[in-house]
Structures are given as C-alpha cells and as structure tokens.
Design a protein with these regions (language model features):
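Conserved micro-motifs of the catalytic ATP-binding
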Residues: 17-22, 55, 59-63
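A conserved beta-strand-to-alpha-helix junction within the catalytic ATP-binding
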Residues: 23-38
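Short conserved segments within the C-terminal catalytic ATPase subdomain
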Residues: 43-52
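Acidic ATP/Mg2+-coordinating residue in the GHKL
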Residues: 109
C-alpha cells in the first residue's frame, strides 16, 4: 500500500497547484479500466477477486493519469472493504443514455456495504468511518481525492450501497466529441 500512499500525496499536492498539467485525450473506458486492474493485479489476486467487464465500450475525453488515479482508489477500496467474502468480485459496466449527454461507468463490488450513517460523509477530507478490516490503514483521503480529481475532470462521482451487499461507484462523463481546446 506504500505506492498508493505516495500516489495520494502526489495527487493531493497536484490538486492544489495553480497550473494543472492535465492532458485530455480520447480514451477507451474499458481499456482504461483494464489497465487500472492490471496495475492493481497483485492486490486483487491476493484478495481472490474475479473481474467482469460488460461488452460495450465507449470513448470519453479525459486525462488518463487522473482517471487511472480515480480507478486505482476505487479498486483499492474494494479490496480494503472486502470483508469475509469468499468470492469477491468487481464488475465494470457502462451505460450510454442515447438521449443524454452523458456516459456512465459503474464499478460494483460485493464486499462490505457502507453504513447508511456514513454515506453522506465518504467524500469528506479525513473521514474514515468504522467499516473494514484495514481501519488502521485508512487515511480518509482516498475518496476525498477521488472527488476532487473527478471535479477537475468534469466527472460526477456517486457511491451507493447495493441491495445484496457491497457498493457501486458510478463515474459519469460528459459526452464530448474532441479534446478541449482543439
């Protein structure tokens, strides 16, 4: 987890910078998800996760480093809060509303749900809640940084509990035809 802690520190300092060096480009959503899974493969394999992807893929305009950071934090949280699940899984699915100007990526796990009393605060700086087996490792910065990075990239982040346990994080991207300023 040391790499993840260092990444959080670097992104925290980057978010406070006056000039942000984002590089917006056309990205395959599922391709980027697969790359984030690959970057976290050891962590996922040690926890016994199975990974599923929907067949549909879409292109979005975003900053790859920023999006990879967001996905890495979400994956890390799924592993942290896997609970006693003997068959943990992550499901990446995409929804494109034809009459909407948005594309949504949902990342669903079947780990520990977030207590309803904690849900309103999960994106607050320093909030750790009282769930999970790695409580002593929680900094309360991961989802805070995810929210800040997502705001910078014009991505909306929503987190909700699943009815059968676990959580779903939904990233909603604006539909943009080409990178900004081009």
């Amino acid at each position: 987890h040391t790499r993840q802690d260092i990444e959080q520190i670097l992104y925290f300092s980057r978010l406070g910078a006056t000039h942000k060096d984002y590089s917006f480009e056309s990205l395959s959503i599922l391709g980027t998800c697969r790359e984030a899974v690959e970057d976290n493969l050891t962590l996922l394999e040690e926890a016994g996760f199975s990974i599923e992807y929907t067949e549909n893929d879409y292109q979005v305009i975003s900053d790859k480093k920023g999006l990879m950071f967001i996905l890495g934090q979400i994956i890390s949280n799924s592993v942290k809060y896997v609970g006693n699940n003997l068959a943990p899984r992550l499901i990446f699915s995409i929804a494109d509303s034809m009459n909407s100007e948005q594309i949504s990526l949902s990342i669903k796990d079947n780990g520990t749900s977030i207590p309803l009393s904690d849900l309103p605060f999960v994106f607050d700086k320093g909030f750790t809640g009282d769930t999970g087996s790695y409580l002593s490792r929680s900094t309360g910065m991961g989802l805070y940084l995810v929210q800040k990075m997502a705001t910078d990239l014009s991505i909306t982040v929503e987190l909700k509990n699943n009815s059968c346990g676990g959580t779903t994080v939904t990233l909603t991207f604006p539909k943009v035809e080409r990178p900004f300023g081009r």
